[in-house]
Amino acid sequence: MLVSKKPMVLVILDGYGYREEQQDNAIFSAKTPVMDALWANRPHTLIDASGLEVGLPDRQMGNSEVGHVNLGAGRIVYQDLTRLDVEIKDRAFFANPVLTGAVDKAKNAGKAVHIMGLLSAGGVHSHEDHIMAMVELAAERGAEKIYLHAFLDGRDTPPRSAESSLKKFEEKFAALGKGRVASIIGRYYAMDRDNRWDRVEKAYDLLTLAQGEFQADTAVAGLQAAYARDENDEFVKATVIRAEGQPDAAMEDGDALIFMNFRADRAREITRAFVNADFDGFARKKVVNVDFVMLTEYAADIKTAVAYPPASLVNTFGEWMAKNDKTQLRISETEKYAHVTFFFNGGVEESFKGEDRILINSPKVATYDLQPEMSSAELTEKLVAAIKSGKYDTIICNYPNGDMVGHTGVMEAAVKAVEALDHCVEEVAKAVESVGGQLLITADHGNAEQMRDPATGQAHTAHTNLPVPLIYVGDKNVKAVEGGKLSDIAPTMLSLMGMEIPQEMTGKPLFIVE
């Protein structure tokens, strides 16, 4: 007869952060007798779910994708922005073999180094500090012809904010005594992602032919002329920057071209125009054979050099379970199904051996404040059945309510969402205890605990950078450890299951069996 398994259950209450202040706090305002009792009577602690502790920039709010990757990985997983910040700070960036190789090859052949990217402090698609580091790398390695092609932002930054960035780079080139800003164009053209190839073509011609609708002696003059035409940063038309007597910066075969955007979606189209031999988005007036480097991998089918290939995560929680012949279930509503599967598995789409998945449809409503309980009753019913089935060694479940209803900014609805969750937690905890299992309750980031922005008085619809609760329910006598973070959860689960923790997991168990 099959032995009935006593599952280790992880319940992730999405957007359920911890905030001492009671004002505009849907979690405090809700009637939550179950969570209150668990917090009062069970081992518990607070853990970090934002900023550096989850691989984001300092104090940046967490999000569901990052949260679940860290939860499943058992180690801090650095996002591209932070990974680059760290590498530049410790100077590993300046020794990156792909970047140095491209620069050295161009320099030794007397060719130019072209650097292009979104010149922005927004930190969403790129960061100007990374572009500055690339300029320094090229100069340090002796490149004489360094051309910067600046894509202007105005979406992740204020609509007219590019001047200070352009000034900074013009001053840098003056100090270096070589290199210059060679072109400016709005991201509307250079960073399209909807196959509007007529836009991309304007950027491509500007880069390859050094031909644009306008020309200016300096980047700042070119920008000011665009503003006079009533073009904000995002929509600045193709402008060649070239003073009298300066050589033109048209791209030639053998030149190096470094694309400094780290986010893929808006980098793919213009990259394909340079890299794909069979490109058919538009008829290219000039096909150049440049040494093209993508800062990160924009798509697996774009065959060109990558300075920072995706870091593959070995021995995530899901993979480790499979290697140890354990059974696991992932269960959530539509809104967070990808998070407990793809993201929790470190970006792996396929399920592991012994991994089942249950998807509960989220309600078809315009906004979730209209149905704050969402599909939590059905989700709980299926989860309780799975706990009692004896089939699973571990179960990962996400309740989306705190986040999805928190995003609406409607306080009354968020309170109802939290109250619905309290009933669900009660059912789940009872089921786990009835089969002798163990339960961890936590969150991936905050949201519902802050429903109004104190500075503006407007509804606060974003995530927070506040800590999240972690509660243990089970028959083990455990002591909580302070100072934890999301990447400590997987090691905590393994330790409570009496399993070895793989060496790749650098997180630490947060409940120590006494």
From Swiss-Prot:
Gene3D superfamilies: Alkaline Phosphatase, subunit A, BPG-independent phosphoglycerate mutase, domain B
Active site: S64 (phosphoserine intermediate)
Residues the entry annotates as binding substrate: H125, R155, D156, R187, R193, R263, A264, D265, R266, K336
Biological processes annotated in GO: carbohydrate metabolic process; glucose catabolic process; glycolytic process; response to oxidative stress
Family annotation (Pfam families): iPGM_N, Metalloenzyme
Cofactor: Mn(2+)
Cystine crosslinks: none
GO MF annotations, alphabetized: manganese ion binding; phosphoglycerate mutase activity
Catalytically driven reaction(s): (2R)-2-phosphoglycerate = (2R)-3-phosphoglycerate
Top EC group: isomerase
Residues at which Mn(2+) 1 binds: D403, H407, H463
Further comment found in the protein's record: Inhibition by vanadate is a diagnostic test for discrimination between the cofactor-dependent (GpmA) and -independent (GpmI) phosphoglycerate mutases.
PANTHER family according to UniProt: 2,3-BISPHOSPHOGLYCERATE-INDEPENDENT PHOSPHOGLYCERATE MUTASE
Protein name as it appears in the record: 2,3-bisphosphoglycerate-independent phosphoglycerate mutase
Organism field: Escherichia coli (strain K12)
Record gene name: gpmI
